[in-house]
């Protein structure tokens, strides 16, 4: 009787190949199979599922916190595409994107997060995908580049993702689910409750800040405060108001669930 093959797991992120969150992602699945890291060379937060089609991409072998990794000069989606079609040359059994430094909750982040974008790219090929993100209390932490890895900071999230990933490998995704979006609250412990949630509508109160350069010409920063209060059952409510782990099942099919006759009256 032949030896069973270890599951192939591809790990990526959007904070860059040297982010401590990527090391946490590796640690969360390292005992579950053969893990390959293919991640952006530099910070790619906010690029969503964007893909590089007007410039060539390069892959560099590197060492990410003591782990062999592939650094891709592109977006998280590029890293997933090259990870599957150039590095692995086959479909993995699971793609894990994360751990993002900063929560990815609400419909705002589903369409803008590079962490989720990379996971969605994998899901588009029928590969089970997980996106994992850690809440920060200071929004400025999202823009830091910490490389000193302290596993205890991620321990609760590592255990949650390990358990979920093991079950996804064992049983596959539920019907009509392409991606599990996992968010870990900042103060999570091993016994922190876990909620299955739906997406809140918004997480940002979008604003634009105008400033002036030394020549008096205007330039702009897109900014905005966080929305911290939302309906019970949403990911924002679970993370921001209750401090619970949030797991949101996501589908690639964005078709509105309405009777099509409702649209025909506009024709």
Swiss-Prot record:
It is an enzyme of class 3 (hydrolase). It catalyses: a ribonucleoside 5'-phosphate + H2O = a ribonucleoside + phosphate. The keyword Disulfide bond does not apply. Its main location: cytoplasm. Binds 1 divalent metal cation per subunit. Keywords: Cytoplasm, Hydrolase, Metal-binding, Nucleotide-binding. Pfam families: SurE. Its EC number is 3.1.3.5. GO terms for molecular function: 5'-nucleotidase activity; metal ion binding; nucleotide binding. InterPro entries: SurE, SurE-like_Pase/nucleotidase, SurE-like_sf. GO terms for cellular component: cytoplasm. Its cofactor is a divalent metal cation. It is found in: Cytoplasm. A divalent metal cation binds at residues 14-15, 45, 100. PANTHER family: 5'-NUCLEOTIDASE SURE (PTHR30457), PHOSPHATASE, PUTATIVE (AFU_ORTHOLOGUE AFUA_4G01070)-RELATED (PTHR30457:SF0). Belongs to the SurE nucleotidase family. HAMAP family: SurE (MF_00060). Nucleotidase that shows phosphatase activity on nucleoside 5'-monophosphates. This is 5'-nucleotidase SurE. It comes from Methanosarcina barkeri (strain Fusaro / DSM 804).
């Amino acid at each position: 009787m032949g030896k069973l093959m270890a599951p192939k797991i591809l790990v990526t992120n959007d904070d860059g190949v040297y982010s401590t969150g990527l090391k946490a992602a590796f640690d969360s699945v390292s005992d579950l199979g053969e893990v390959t890291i293919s991640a952006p060379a530099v910070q790619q937060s906010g690029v969503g599922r964007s893909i590089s089609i007007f410039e060539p991409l390069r892959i560099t072998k590197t060492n990410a916190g003591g782990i062999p990794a592939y650094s891709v000069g592109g977006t998280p989606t590029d890293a997933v595409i090259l990870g599957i079609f150039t590095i692995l040359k086959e479909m993995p059994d699971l793609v894990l994107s994360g751990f993002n430094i900063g929560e990815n909750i609400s419909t705002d982040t589903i369409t803008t997060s590079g962490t989720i974008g990379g996971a969605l790219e994998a899901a588009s090929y029928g590969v089970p995908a997980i996106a994992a993100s850690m809440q920060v209390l200071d929004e400025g932490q999202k823009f830091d580049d910490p490389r000193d890895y302290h596993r205890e900071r991620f321990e609760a999230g590592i255990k949650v993702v390990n358990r979920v990933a093991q079950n996804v490998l064992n049983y596959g995704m539920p019907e009509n689910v392409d991606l599990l979006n996992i968010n870990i609250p900042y103060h999570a412990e091993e016994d922190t409750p876990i909620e299955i949630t739906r997406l809140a509508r918004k997480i940002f109160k979008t604003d634009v800040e105008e400033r002036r350069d030394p020549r008096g010409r205007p330039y702009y920063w897109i900014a905005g405060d966080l929305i911290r209060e939302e309906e019970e059952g949403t990911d924002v409510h679970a993370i921001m108001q209750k401090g619970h782990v949030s797991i949101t099942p996501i589908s690639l099919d964005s078709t509105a669930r309405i009777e099509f006759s409702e649209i025909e009256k506009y024709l």
